[in-house]
Amino acid sequence: MKVYIETMGCAMNSRDSEHLLSELSKLDYKETSDPKMADLILINTCSVREKPERKLFSEIGQFAKIKKPNAKIGVCGCTASHMGADILKKAPSVSFVLGARNVSKISQVIHKEKAVEVAIDYDESAYAFEFFEKKAQIRSLLNISIGCDKKCAYCIVPHTRGKEISIPMDLILKEAEKLANNGTKELMLLGQNVNNYGVRFSSEHAKVDFSDLLDKLSEIPGIERIRFTSPHPLHMNDGFLERFAKNPKVCKSIHMPLQSGSSAVLKMMRRGYSKEWFLNRVERLKALVPEVGISTDIIVGFPNESDKDFEDTMEVLEKVRFDTLYSFIYSPRPFTEAGAWKERVPLEVSSSRLERLQNRHKEILEEKAKLEVGKTHVVLVENRREMDNQIVGFEGRSDTGKFIEVTCKEKRNPGELVKVEIISHSKGRLIAAIKGN
């Protein structure tokens, strides 16, 4: 039996797809990259924006046309959580719907017709923190919490993922040790509000926080690097930033989701901080780690966003000079406060703002890339680069999150840490040679 999984959205969805595959492997399913050959097609969905939801029904239609006659289609993930049985009504070719917090039930629903499992409000004490068998890999995703208690006006995640629960630290450490023994060199810690770790456990456990967890994980032999996503700026206090800076195994790259550079818009968004507060956190971080790589999320066209509000966002872009930018036009979502508001920024205005934001960020990346030439980085080898069956180099990321293409004829294995020097750049890409060659 073969299964094809289409994964949309965030790293948490990628982790859930790994979990789905692990559960199905117990039933002798093997993964295939060709949906035409699959006995089971799963679409693991994202509902953060409207566009992926529209794409879902297009994907269902395409898969229904090409699938084997008896193959089943299942919809999983966040869109499944909030649409539930409505998906079955809109897409009769779908056999079952499985919500984001019901992944472990996949074996119970694949043999049913028109099954719906989308509950998110079950007993916390009974919640199984399902660590599962994974393929050996250099970089592994590791869940440390699930759900979110924030009430951002635009965000559907608390509705689809449920309330925030931290996984007990002893379970996380056991899983990390297992991954390290299986060859993992870099951990990516996952949570909707990852740096709020410790806020609530499923049962009584000693009080710990995110920095405590990072320190413990860094002691595990074999783990060379630790990254995490997605944190909330509100929890980036001085204590956290200082311990982040001091821990040598915690990568010096961090996601700081701004969302808007306007204090007025941030207040409407219910983000809990101001433009000035955000810039203060960045200033403190850069004082501790001058070379830190910072990524961010920005929404343009939020209801009532004025020209001045957008200029405030552009001002923050100029001051921080983010290394990575994920930017989108505001998308109204069901079950959110802002989704019920009637005020809308015209699409042509939002589109113009997005284009301007993205174009300026591309220029910033070019400016920053020029300054990288001559600098050295330690790269974790992820993939070899080959041409005509000859090794021409490898690819990987620096400690600060920079993606680097390295030119060399030497064989370097995935998982190695290699010191390189940036020799050139092209359209924001960094090209390097092994240091000393």
Swiss-Prot record:
It comes from the Bacteria. [4Fe-4S] cluster 1 binds at residues 10, 46, 78. InterPro entries: Elp3/MiaA/NifB-like_rSAM, Methylthiotransferase, Methylthiotransferase_CS, Methylthiotransferase_N, Methylthiotransferase_N_sf, MiaB_methiolase, rSAM, rSAM_horseshoe. Residues 134-367 form the Radical SAM core domain. It is found in: Cytoplasm. Gene3D superfamilies: Methylthiotransferase, N-terminal domain (3.40.50.12160), tm_1862 like domain (3.80.30.20). Residues 1-115 form the MTTase N-terminal domain. [4Fe-4S] cluster 2 binds at residues 148, 152, 155. Residues 370-436 form the TRAM domain. Its main location: cytoplasm. Its cofactor is [4Fe-4S] cluster. GO terms for molecular function: 4 iron, 4 sulfur cluster binding; metal ion binding; N6-isopentenyladenosine methylthiotransferase activity. PROSITE patterns: MTTASE_N, MTTASE_RADICAL, RADICAL_SAM, TRAM. Its EC number is 2.8.4.3. Binds 2 [4Fe-4S] clusters. One cluster is coordinated with 3 cysteines and an exchangeable S-adenosyl-L-methionine. Monomer. Belongs to the methylthiotransferase family. MiaB subfamily. Catalyzes the methylthiolation of N6-(dimethylallyl)adenosine (i(6)A), leading to the formation of 2-methylthio-N6-(dimethylallyl)adenosine (ms(2)i(6)A) at position 37 in tRNAs that read codons beginning with uridine. This is tRNA-2-methylthio-N(6)-dimethylallyladenosine synthase. The gene is miaB.
